[in-house]
Amino acid sequence: MNLWVTGYRSYELGVFNSKDKKVEVIKYALQKKILEKLDEGLEWVITGAQMGIEQWTCEVVAEMKKEYPELKLAIMMPYSEFAGNWNEANQESFSIRCSLADFVGEVSKEKYKSPMQLKNYQNFMLDHTDQAMLIYDPEHEGKTKYDYEMIKKYSEQEDYSYDLVDMYQLQEFAEMYQEKDSF
């Protein structure tokens, strides 16, 4: 099974530092959800490279591969030179995440030209995955809204399921994480 993982950008969560406790909780949630999917036959985690959920997913999967070497990570970008306009620190972070992946690719070999490239990216991700997992809450909109709407519509027409980890579930994961740390 191939799983598309996406979600909030770091700034949408108010995270501006990788040492923020929210990042630890989100990584914990990602790990727990990916472990569930491994039991269902997960082989590939396919994600983008946006700062936030997607890059944290790369870190989590890279760490999990030590214990689950059969797990693979692919990073797909909607167009070439995806991180080209990012500052140096973010570009370095992007490069590090890409080095963790088993496969890195671009849906369009051209630089950004139009929103159609983003639509093509969504279609590519849907065509190359069996399920999606979103760290996203429709009550707290962000840029992931567009992926969520596309996935929801697609799942109504195709045999495609998705997990939505909303703010309530993130709070539950935060409590589990805190309990784990207190032992």
UniProtKB/Swiss-Prot annotation:
It comes from the Bacteria. InterPro entries: YspA (IPR010697). SUPFAM superfamilies: MCP/YpsA-like. Belongs to the UPF0398 family. This is UPF0398 protein LSL_0930. It comes from Ligilactobacillus salivarius (strain UCC118). The lineage of its organism: Bacteria, Bacillati, Bacillota, Bacilli, Lactobacillales.
